[in-house]
Every structure is written in C-alpha cells, then in structure tokens.
Amino acid sequence: MSRDVLTPYPGLATSVGYYFSAMEEVREQLRNAVKDMDVQPLGRTAFRGAHSIGALVLHIGEAEWWWMQCNVAGHRLTEQDQQAACWDVLDEPDAFLAKGYTAEFCLAELDKIRNQTRGILVGLTENDLERIITFERHGEMRDHSLRWILHHLIDHEAQHKGQILMLKRIMALN
C-alpha cells in the first residue's frame, strides 16, 4: 500500500517546516517534469504569446527570491540582483531560447534560491507565521502574513508546474 504523508522539514519550527516540506514536494514534481528536457524544447515557445518552459522554471525562482529576500528578509533590490538569470525572465518570451540555458542550469538556479529561502526560515518560530509584512507594490501598500506568503509560493509553483505539464503535452514532449 502506498502512503503519502507530509512531515515538517528538520531544523525548522514545526509549522514553518510543514510549509517548507510542501514547497519541497512541489519542487520535486517540477524537477521531475523538466530535468530530462533538451535545450531546444526547454527554450522554445509552444505558440505565439506563450512562455517557454525554461522561462517559467526561472520565473518560479524569481518569484520565490523576490518574496523571501525583498519582502520577508527586507533586502533592497540592486542592479546586480536584476542581472540574475531569473530576473524579468518572462518579459521577452522569444529571447529565452537564445540564452541556451539547460534544464540542469535552470534547476540549479532554483536550488540556490531555495537554499537562501531555507536560510531565512531557519531562525523563525511558530509565531513568525502570523507576522505581517508590509511593502509597496505597483504604488500600493500591501500587507501579507508570512503564512500567506509561504502558501502563495506553494500555490504559485504548483500552478506553473501545471502550466509546464500542459505545454509539454501541447509540444508532444511526454
């Protein structure tokens, strides 16, 4: 009999560890979906207006980095940050293929970001999940709890994973 259970990630406060374990579960599903893809199918778009699978993978990392580093940890975005491979990766859908990024490269970028996220979460307590983080976005002040941010990151990655799986079917890559 198969049994799936979610356990808290070791070294993190219990509830924080459950969120991180859920993030890791979705990441493993994403990794399995793209790890064996060649550069061409990873980088090309399935149809006009679509994003490439590789760009979506890096966008997942960009979102996690922005939420965790800039909002949770309070990092101020620099010009150097904006040179990262994942930054604004969805802005020019047709430009991604020319970069020649491999699946291994894209997943390694995600691993770096995930390690940074884990580093932020290590020192947090159960009570920190209710901490309200206030920031400006698109000229509007926003409040989000850390619990909501972690949930959002799981949901965001899961949605894009589904999009990636759909694109693979459209491109006959299954």
Describe the predicted segments one by one.
Residues 36, 59-60, 123:
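Conserved catalytic core of Hanks-type protein kinase domains
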Residues 15-19:
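Short Lys/Arg-rich basic patches
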Residues 89-131, 148-156:
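Acidic/histidine-rich alpha-helical segments that form the ligand environment
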Residues 23, 27-30, 34, 110, ...:
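Hydrophobic alpha-helical core bundles mediating ligand binding, dimerization, or RNAP-core interactions
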Residues 2-9, 20-24, 28-31, 40-91, ...:
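Short, contiguous alpha-helical
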Residues 1-2, 115:
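Contiguous N-terminal and early-domain "leader" segments and peripheral loops that mark the onset or edge
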